[in-house]
Amino acid sequence: MTRRYWNINLKEMIEAGVHFGHGIKKWNPKMAPYISAKRKGTHITNLARTTRFLSEACDLVFDAASQGKSFLIVGTKKRAADLVASAAIRARCHYVNKKWFSGMLTNWSITKTRLSQFRDLRAEEKMEKFHHLPKRDVAILKRKLSTLQRYLGGIKYMTRLPDIVIVLDQQKEYIALRECAILGIPTISLADTNCDPDLANISIPANDDTMTSIRLILNKLVFAICEGRSLYIRNH
């Protein structure tokens, strides 16, 4: 994997609050190598380590994107839902931003069936096939379609398991990380001071609670994916 320069700026990270961790009583001792100080009862993340692992993650996704690999971005915090969707769409990635259903990847055959039903319902609605049905049936189908859109809309074009999964909140998306580990899917995860850095293939030490921090990290990764996609298009 070739190392590249991703313009990861220390001042920019400080302004975004990437370095702010949790209170010292909530920490995970496994994060000790990634913590540089304690300030007013709060752990401070070592931004030199953040820079290193964010750079490694950017290199990984760039190389994968340049080979035409697929990505899934997972972030189901309510405040981050729109950010996850817009970033994923920009980089042509799949995404889950509402709720992670247990077995979404490990029971892929079931997920694939639901996605097929979802696509069929969308096609029928677009072709106005619902108009020939009784009103009660139309209402039921529209409710079902709305639910499928809400929870599966971000993966509606996913026809196989993703090659790399990016997770924005390790603790909230623990089940997603475990499913990836079972299936051997490489993962990249933000790791706040209360997290376990061993749960992902690349853990980026960073504040996973503040929107400015999440946005900065996600934007760097998405930029690297877009650059890799451009190279793939040029070579094919």
From Swiss-Prot:
GO terms for molecular function: structural constituent of ribosome. One of its GO terms (biological process) is translation. Keywords: Chloroplast, Plastid, Ribonucleoprotein, Ribosomal protein. Gene3D superfamilies: Glucose-6-phosphate isomerase like protein, domain 1 (3.40.50.10490), Helix hairpin bin (1.10.287.610). Its main location: plastid. It comes from the Eukaryota. GO terms for cellular component: chloroplast; mitochondrial small ribosomal subunit; plastid. Transmembrane segments: none annotated. Coiled coil: none annotated. Disulfide bonds: none annotated. Belongs to the universal ribosomal protein uS2 family. NCBIfam families: rpsB_bact. This is Small ribosomal subunit protein uS2c. It comes from Oryza sativa subsp. indica (Rice). The gene is rps2.
